[in-house]
């Protein structure tokens, strides 16, 4: 879908990749920008910068998500592109116990990384299907294709986000609604413990939010289901599929390196 002239709604857009996406959409000629974030002040600041509307929203609350979509439709008449981007960061890694996360942590990860996408898609799909046009983007993670060593709940729920996007593409891809799942790896955000002002290329394998947003926008305009901000992830994913046992052994070696205090670096 070409972004020019569209109305885009982005969740988790008060900062990070979400905010960078709003800026990227505006640069590409979007007619309307709807910024939703748990931090309403940040959402309003981004919206003011871009001439859009900013709304506070807890993406785990289905009624709140519907309210944001209703506000977008009241202002612009429709939502053409939904980027369901809100997410939680990886917790402190537990390299020895894959089941150490509390039930509350599991539920929170599930609510944000899976059900938030469900709530958002349910809210915008009726209008898209009625018009026979629209685009859904779930922002997951490379961990949804591979795994995040030491954080099982994060990995499992990001896999769930990928699976949901697959089901959406199967159900609606021939009804005028495009679907993508974005699976970024290392991006300089507060969620990954890095500063958004990190210069491009200053850390091996780490992208700026602007680079990630540009790659995601390119994927939307090229109607690509799987959007990889880090192309090397495709090779890792193919290696996993071709020899699962070998891949698991490699991930154990990654775990051992992390246990020894090594920083996992990805070649750009």
Where are these regions (language model features)?
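Catalytic Tyr-X3-Lys loop
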Residues: 88, 99-118, 133, 137, ...
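Active-site Tyr-X3-Lys motif and surrounding loop/helix of classical short-chain dehydrogenase/reductase
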Residues: 67-74, 93-100, 104-111
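The beta1-alpha1 cofactor-binding region of Rossmann-like NAD(H)/NADP(H)-dependent oxidoreductases
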Residues: 40-41, 57-68, 103
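Canonical Rossmann dinucleotide-binding motif of NAD(H)/NADP(H)-dependent dehydrogenases/reductases
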Residues: 2-33
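C-terminal helical subdomain
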Residues: 181, 197-236
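Active-site-adjacent segment of SDR/Rossmann-fold oxidoreductases
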Residues: 28, 146, 167-177
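Active-site helix of classical SDR
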Residues: 121, 157
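Residue(s) in the substrate-gating loop at a strand-loop-helix junction
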Residues: 141
């Amino acid at each position: 879908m070409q972004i020019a002239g569209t109305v885009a709604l982005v969740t988790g857009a008060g900062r990070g990749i979400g905010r960078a996406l709003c800026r990227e959409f505006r640069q590409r000629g979007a007619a309307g920008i709807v910024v939703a974030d748990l931090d309403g002040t940040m959402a309003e600041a981004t919206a003011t910068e871009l001439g859009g509307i900013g709304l506070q929203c807890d993406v785990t609350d289905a009624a709140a998500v519907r309210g944001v979509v209703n506000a977008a439709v009241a202002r612009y008449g429709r939502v053409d592109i939904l980027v369901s981007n809100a997410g939680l960061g990886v917790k402190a890694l537990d390299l020895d116990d894959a089941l150490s996360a509390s039930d509350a942590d599991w539920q929170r990860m599930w609510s944000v990384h899976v059900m938030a996408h469900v709530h958002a898609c349910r809210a915008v799909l009726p209008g898209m299907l009625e018009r026979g046009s629209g685009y859904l983007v779930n922002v997951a993670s490379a961990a949804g294709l591979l795994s995040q060593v030491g954080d099982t709940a994060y990995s499992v729920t990001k896999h769930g986000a990928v699976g949901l996007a697959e089901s959406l593409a199967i159900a609606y891809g021939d009804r005028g609604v495009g679907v993508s799942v974005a699976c970024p790896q290392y991006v300089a955000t507060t969620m990954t413990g890095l500063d958004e002002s990190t210069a491009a290329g200053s850390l091996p394998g780490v992208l700026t939010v602007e680079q990630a947003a540009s790659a995601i926008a390119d994927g939307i305009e090229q109607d690509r289901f799987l959007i990889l901000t880090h192309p090397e992830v495709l090779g890792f994913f193919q290696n996993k599929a071709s020899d699962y046992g070998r891949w698991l052994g490699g991930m154990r070696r990654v775990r051992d390196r992390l246990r020894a205090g090594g920083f996992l670096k990805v070649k750009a």
